[in-house]
Amino acid sequence: MCSVLIFISILTVLAQCQKIPRFDVSNSELLAMAQKLRQVDTNRARPDQIKLNYQGHTVTRDDSDAAQAKLFSKVDTSLFRKPSYELYINLMDNFNRQTGVIEPRVSQAEEKNEVGKFLDYVLESRPMQELYNWFKAKGHPIATSPQVFRFWIGQLWFSHYSRALGRPDTSGFEHVFIGEAKNGEISGMHNWVRFYVLENNRTENFDYKGFTVKRFNIMAALKFTWDGLLKRAGSILIGTSPEFDMALYTMCFLSRRGRETCDVEFDGCPLQITSFEIMQQNKVYIGSIYPTAGRITDQCRAQNRFN
């Protein structure tokens, strides 16, 4: 009973004034940890499970179309029967795309239940367990216990805050993993599974228009329209599991949010992860997180020459 009261009191203090200290970690440590997360991402797609059709290069200054076909010419949909993918896809209809509209789109009970199931699985996954143990070993306050870690992951990613009109209309998860409409354009949406689902649902009126940057089957920045609204360059990691993206992005957010990028490397290809926080009512939320391509290297080309 005493331990329960202590835990509740800790969460009460956290809820009242949320300030996450800067994390003193070197670039080499982040690089090594990112590669470790990739190694344990056993739910990511194998190279033979995804085939991309990038088609034409395009630019961000207009809405020109350099792609007549879909981006994904092949995806082994057995991937989507894995629990994290299935639970993620179940969450996709919970959100109002337009900013300024109060969330959730479904009942609060349904949202709480589906988010809870997703977090239950993700927090027990290998990438998130590795991340928790790493933070705990380094004494980060987000990982003093599994309960505190869950609180912060839920707060940073799923708690609602306002992006427009002062209404609780968004969350870090919605922005990064789902996508939003603001000021007549698409904002956020940095996940390959979401891209694939929208591209293969005719009712979404989704049109891929070409790439601005591509790094084989690892990462790309893509132009598209969604129900007539333009996204000039939306960047995604390709083939990664939902739990990997959440673990990597959480690590980078807590370590390098703001002006610094989180520099990582996958399959020989350098990438940067950019992240921003939003503070409202003394609480901290994920504002945005997205990958960008680093300089193309001979190692990147050599390791991915068959992709």
Swiss-Prot record:
<keyword id="KW-0540">Nuclease</keyword>
<feature type="glycosylation site" description="N-linked (GlcNAc...) asparagine">
    <location>
        <position position="201"/>
    </location>
</feature>
<feature type="domain" description="EndoU">
    <location>
        <begin position="26"/>
        <end position="295"/>
    </location>
</feature>
<keyword id="KW-0479">Metal-binding</keyword>
<dbReference type="GO" id="GO:0003723">
    <property type="term" value="F:RNA binding"/>
</dbReference>
<comment type="similarity">
    <text>Belongs to the ENDOU family.</text>
</comment>
<dbReference type="Pfam" id="PF09412">
    <property type="entry name" value="XendoU"/>
</dbReference>
<keyword id="KW-0964">Secreted</keyword>
<dbReference type="InterPro" id="IPR018998">
    <property type="entry name" value="EndoU_C"/>
</dbReference>
<dbReference type="InterPro" id="IPR039787">
    <property type="entry name" value="ENDOU"/>
</dbReference>
<dbReference type="GO" id="GO:0004521">
    <property type="term" value="F:RNA endonuclease activity"/>
</dbReference>
<feature type="signal peptide">
    <location>
        <begin position="1"/>
        <end position="17"/>
    </location>
</feature>
<protein>
    <recommendedName>
        <fullName>Endoribonuclease endu-1</fullName>
        <ecNumber>4.6.1.-</ecNumber>
    </recommendedName>
</protein>
<keyword id="KW-0255">Endonuclease</keyword>
<comment type="function">
    <text>Catalyzes RNA cleavage releasing a product with a 2',3'-cyclic phosphate at the 3'-end.</text>
</comment>
<keyword id="KW-0732">Signal</keyword>
<keyword id="KW-0325">Glycoprotein</keyword>
<dbReference type="GO" id="GO:0016829">
    <property type="term" value="F:lyase activity"/>
</dbReference>
<feature type="active site">
    <location>
        <position position="175"/>
    </location>
</feature>
<comment type="subunit">
    <text>Monomer.</text>
</comment>
<feature type="active site">
    <location>
        <position position="231"/>
    </location>
</feature>
<dbReference type="GO" id="GO:0046872">
    <property type="term" value="F:metal ion binding"/>
</dbReference>
<keyword id="KW-0694">RNA-binding</keyword>
<dbReference type="InterPro" id="IPR037227">
    <property type="entry name" value="EndoU-like"/>
</dbReference>
<keyword id="KW-0456">Lyase</keyword>
<feature type="active site">
    <location>
        <position position="190"/>
    </location>
</feature>
<dbReference type="GO" id="GO:0005576">
    <property type="term" value="C:extracellular region"/>
</dbReference>
<keyword id="KW-0378">Hydrolase</keyword>
<keyword id="KW-0464">Manganese</keyword>
